[in-house]
Amino acid sequence: MAKEARQLNILLVDELPERSLAMEKLLTNLGHKIVARASAGDDLSEIVSRNLPDIIIIDMDSPDRDTLEHMQTISSDRPRPIVMFTNDDDSETIRKAVRAGVTAYVVDGLQPQRVVPILETAIARFNEFQNIRQELESTRNTLEERKLVERAKGILMKQSDYDEETAYKAMQKIAMNRNMKLVDLARSIIAAAELLK
């Protein structure tokens, strides 16, 4: 038994009005809502900010540079799944589209029976990518915090003639007594050492 798909709020971008109407009819018949329509030349970033669609669907013969730049901006500022239906199967264009944040790049246009699986796949892929991106950011932050703590520990070892373990325990004790995070104390130690240079 197939599960019922949730209603998606969609930004529909299309170069041709008659094709846009056909796509809109198909999507609304599937239970989705078109929250905005645009053409490739419109300021897509602003339209996304104003309408907050769940997903962006672009139907065009070949993505132009401006459209790809808009996709890059959207992917940076307000990430969301982007599905592009196109006739352009050039591998360089595909690479540029994926780098710009396109989640699903579908060549040979739109076939009604494929829409639901394509949208579901694009959303799942987008969510997985966002999870990976968040994990990477968290790992980067943890690594940066460790570097700061190590640097501050080195400063204490040099200035107070502590060994590594004693310096670390001293930092932990001070942070606990001041109700601070260890990394915030490390930043303070580094800043103070910079002032005393």
Where are these regions (language model features)?
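Conserved phosphotransfer microenvironments
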Residues: 20, 41-45, 54-73
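C-terminal output helix
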Residues: 92, 110-119
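Conserved acidic segment of CheY-like receiver
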Residues: 6-18, 23-27, 56
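Receiver (REC) domain switch/output surface
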Residues: 26, 115-127
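A short, hydrophobic beta-strand element within the central beta-sheet of small alpha/beta folds
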Residues: 79-89
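Short hydrophobic/Thr-rich beta-strand motif most characteristic of the beta2 strand and flanking loop
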Residues: 31-40
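C-terminal output/effector regions of signal-responsive regulators
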Residues: 137-197
